[in-house]
Regions:
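Short, flexible loop/hinge motifs at secondary-structure junctions
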Residues: 1-168, 234, 239
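Catalytic center-proximal scaffold of phosphoryl-transfer enzymes
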Residues: 17, 143-147, 152-495
Length: 495
């Protein structure tokens, strides 16, 4: 029986006349339908109750009615505003200005007498920081042609390697084109408009694409070195992925990153096959930080670390949606452990005391036990046919199982201070991929998406190293891309 096949009044009277057994059977069918509808309503209400602060949904999905956020940060004791020692960005006068413009005093403000011939006794100074008028500089390269006085052969000098065309743009100009198109996500046509507005230089869309492709090709050796280094580094490696529409199909951009390096790669798959294609996770033996997506755990040679930011959001959801007291208490405990680790680090300690670890582990297990008592396993319906696989569980039970089975990954930050509490590093490194998708909607070709990932890996790494993005792109387009210090030949040989 379905909701569209409910009995009519005539059918109900007929059932009543058939006797008690017929009525009981009809009620059992209706009860089964009600339970199914209740489960469906619960799933739909759960979806509506989720937002950016209690799930992995992005803030852009919240709409105009922002949810009331639960503050997860604890008071730091710091005053509001800039902190002592903060460098600031105050505009300050310089000792040697580029140009001085003198404003003469012509008449006395008191008696109106002429001051044209009066002696200047001093100056009140004010400085204006302004852009000069910018125009493209055209550099003509001339290769000498000389006949040989001995044999008469005509000889022509060689042009520099970077001067390969009769007319072309230089690396600094192309760096700005790539900067606007790839870093600030301006579409091709708007990038062309910007170059006209800034330099009065019309630019075709093909030139923008060609500049980006050239930059991607030039930074390939850097990205290859980054990828190899991330496999071997002793630092915790952050992993994540996000969906991207490419050539009318769903693809995935995978990130592997540290605080100093970023590597992005496009793949048509999300899970284990993508990790095998990329080749970082299968060879990784150190810490890997990620969410609870099961495909990550298929590679057991790595030391897995679970992102607790995801756990906090799920615990908030369970407490708000189902009033699960244990969820709020476990959230508080995780934040308490995090605070204890930070306090110990500030005190110069390298680990928590054994008594602290034992106490936190005991309280963690006690809250899991409390959660299991509040969320017993589902009771199979004897009237329903058996299905393959595990019976469907509640969201609370699923989270409890993950927190229990992967407790070492959840609490890894407590055992080793090198391990971060969350996977925010990878999420930050993927954020610009989503911004690019918001601006452009999709990539029409795989080659365009791969170009974006290659350039984004390079400029994200350069930014982490404190290098100007424009300077990094100029170096790449000039044929000498920037290599981070950790990837220099001397550093690699020492390692």
């Amino acid at each position: 029986m379905t909701s569209s096949q409910l009995p009519t009044p005539e059918e109900i009277r007929s059932l009543y006349q058939q006797g008690e057994e017929a009525v009981v059977a009809a009620f059992e069918q209706l009860a089964t339908l009600v339970r199914a509808l209740e489960q469906r309503v619960q799933v739909l209400e759960d979806q509506l109750a989720k937002n950016s602060h209690n799930s992995s949904q992005p803030p852009s999905s919240d709409g105009f009615k922002k949810p009331k956020r639960r503050g997860l940060r604890r008071p730091s004791g710091k005053q509001v505003g800039g902190q002592p020692g903060h460098p600031g960005q105050t505009l300050k006068a310089v000792a040697q200005p580029d140009r001085v413009q003198v404003h003469p005093v012509k008449r006395c403000q008191a008696c109106q007498a002429s001051l044209t011939t009066a002696e200047v006794t001093g100056y009140e100074r004010r400085q204006v920081f302004e852009l000069p008028v910018v125009r493209l500089e055209v550099i003509e390269h001339q290769a000498e042609i000389k006949p040989c006085p001995q044999c008469g052969a005509v000889n022509t000098a060689e042009f520099p390697v970077e001067v390969s065309q009769p007319v072309q743009y230089g690396p600094r100009f192309k760096a700005q084109v790539v900067y606007f198109n790839q870093y600030h996500h301006l579409p091709i046509e708007r990038t062309s408009e910007v170059m006209v507005d800034l330099y009065q230089q019309p630019l075709s869309g093909g030139t923008v694409v060609a500049a980006s492709q050239q930059a991607a090709q030039q930074v390939t050796p850097v990205n290859t070195a980054i990828k190899a280094h991330l496999i071997e580094t002793s630092e915790p490696l952050h992993l994540d992925e996000t969906g991207l529409r490419v050539a009318e199909q769903l693809h995935w951009v995978h990130v592997a990153s540290t605080a100093d390096l970023t590597y992005l790669e496009l793949n048509a798959r999300r899970g284990a096959q993508a990790h095998a294609d990329i080749g970082i996770l299968p060879q990784r033996q150190g810490y890997v930080v990620h969410d609870d997506y099961p495909a990550y755990y298929q590679y057991q040679i790595a030391q897995h670390v679970s992102c607790n930011a995801h756990h906090l959001r799920e615990l908030i959801f369970l407490h708000e949606r189902y009033q699960q007291l244990w969820a709020e208490q476990l959230l508080t405990l995780l934040l308490e452990i995090k605070q204890a680790v930070e306090t110990a680090q500030q005190a110069g300690q390298t680990a928590l005391t054994p008594s602290q670890v034992v106490d936190f582990e005991r309280r963690y297990q006690a809250l899991l036990d409390q959660g299991y008592q509040a969320n017993p396993p589902p009771v199979p319906d004897p009237d329903r046919p058996k299905r393959r696989g595990k019976p469907k569980q509640s969201p609370a039970r699923n989270l409890l199982d993950r927190l229990h089975q992967r407790r070492s990954a959840v609490l890894a930050f407590m055992y080793d201070f090198k391990v971060p509490f969350d996977n925010n590093q990878a999420e930050r490194d993927l954020r610009m991929v989503k911004l690019k998708q918001k601006v452009s909607g999709c990539f029409r070709t795989q080659h365009g998406a791969q170009t974006f990932c290659a350039i984004r890996s390079y400029i994200s790494t350069a930014r982490k190293q404190g290098l100007s993005i424009l300077d990094a792109l100029h170096l790449a387009l000039a044929g000498t891309p920037f290599f981070p210090p950790a990837l220099q030949p001397s550093a690699l040989s020492d390692a």
